[in-house]
């Protein structure tokens, strides 16, 4: 039989051991006696092949056997205050923004799936992504002091040094509250956005008050110059509008002037014309101020 042959091979292996083996003679005798015992034990056993008639297969007509068909499922009563969990196919009551905020508080900003210059971009949602820009620094909040900003000019300038040329951007910005206060600023930076921001700060440091009448025009004529630029300003009747061009028009509109005439002479330089406009405005005076200096009432000012 197969079992007897396997045991006989085992006994033969145990008997033909090498002389260099570390096994003692007593252990060898015990192995031989054990193998002979197995031969006598299993030599009397005979293997019988099972036939197909010896097996029986039972098929249930009903999917539920009789044992469990009559059993009624009776779950225990839920305790007081128990809230059943939602089903897997039911949506959450939280909004996407609440889920995103909770995720950000626990795990920090999520990976947007985009990379720039070999660096992963971590952003929470589309709103934050638009405000910060992909791969860029987050935008700074604008200064809310009632002043509006208008860019007059942005130019690229270079500075020649020993090592080569240094490229920068120069921006001219006019700020005003359209209530008689206006300022002109100029600054340079390596980026356009930084140059505009620095120019706006410089313009806020040089605020000038523009005297106006109740018709939103100048009280009288005035002229101003800055370098080679010369600007003439004239009052206008209601409904005329601002008739001027270039930097002069921007300065007058940001100051809140609605009816005025302006003319720039001598130079087309935007910065010099803007500063010449401020110089002309600073020479204007209100009628009541002149009457107060002279010590007379305003009715006698034109006598």
UniProtKB/Swiss-Prot annotation:
GO terms for biological process: adaxial/abaxial pattern specification; chloroplast rRNA processing; plastid translation; response to cold. The keyword Isomerase does not apply. Transmembrane segments: none annotated. Binds directly to 16S ribosomal RNA. The lineage of its organism: Eukaryota, Viridiplantae, Streptophyta, Embryophyta, Tracheophyta. Residues 147-210 form the S5 DRBM domain. GO terms for molecular function: mRNA binding; rRNA binding; structural constituent of ribosome. The keyword NADP does not apply. Its main location: plastid. Pfam families: Ribosomal_S5, Ribosomal_S5_C. PANTHER family: RIBOSOMAL S SUBUNIT, SMALL RIBOSOMAL SUBUNIT PROTEIN US5M. Keywords: Chloroplast, Plastid, Ribonucleoprotein, Ribosomal protein, RNA-binding, rRNA-binding, Transit peptide. InterPro entries: Ribosomal_Su5_D2-typ_SF, Ribosomal_uS5, Ribosomal_uS5_bac-type, Ribosomal_uS5_C, Ribosomal_uS5_N, Ribosomal_uS5_N_CS, Ribsml_uS5_D2-typ_fold_subgr. It is found in: Plastid, Chloroplast. This is Small ribosomal subunit protein uS5c. One of its GO terms (cellular component) is small ribosomal subunit. Belongs to the universal ribosomal protein uS5 family. Part of the 30S ribosomal subunit.
């Amino acid at each position: 039989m197969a079992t007897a042959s396997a045991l006989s091979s085992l006994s033969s292996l145990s008997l033909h051991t090498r002389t260099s083996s570390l096994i003692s003679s007593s252990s060898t005798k015990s192995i031989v006696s054990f193998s002979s015992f197995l031969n006598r034990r299993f030599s009397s056993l005979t293997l019988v092949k099972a036939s197909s008639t010896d097996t029986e297969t039972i098929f249930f007509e009903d999917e539920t056997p009789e044992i469990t068909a009559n059993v009624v499922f009776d779950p225990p009563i839920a305790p007081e205050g128990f809230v059943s969990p939602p089903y897997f196919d039911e949506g959450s009551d939280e909004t996407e923004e609440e889920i995103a905020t909770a995720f950000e508080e626990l795990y920090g900003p999520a990976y947007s799936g985009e990379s720039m210059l070999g660096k992963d971009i971590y952003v929470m949602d589309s709103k934050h992504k638009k405000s910060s820009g992909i791969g860029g620094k987050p935008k700074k909040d604008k200064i809310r002091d009632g002043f509006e900003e208008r860019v007059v000019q942005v130019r690229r300038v270079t500075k020649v040094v020993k090592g080569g040329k240094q490229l920068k951007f120069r921006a001219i910005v006019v700020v005003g509250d359209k209530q008689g206060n206006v300022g002109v600023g100029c600054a340079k930076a390596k980026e356009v956005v930084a140059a505009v921001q620095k120019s706006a700060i410089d313009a806020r440091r040089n605020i000038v008050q523009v005297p106006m009448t109740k018709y939103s025009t100048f009280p009288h004529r005035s002229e101003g110059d800055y370098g080679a630029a010369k600007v003439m300003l004239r009052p206008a009747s209601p409904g005329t509008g601002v008739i001027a061009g270039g930097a002069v028009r921007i300065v007058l509109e940001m100051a809140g002037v609605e009816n005025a005439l302006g003319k720039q002479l001598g130079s087309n330089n935007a910065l010099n014309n803007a500063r010449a406009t401020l110089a002309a405005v600073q020479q204007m005076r209100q009628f009541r101020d002149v009457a107060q200096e002279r010590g007379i009432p305003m009715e006698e000012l034109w006598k």
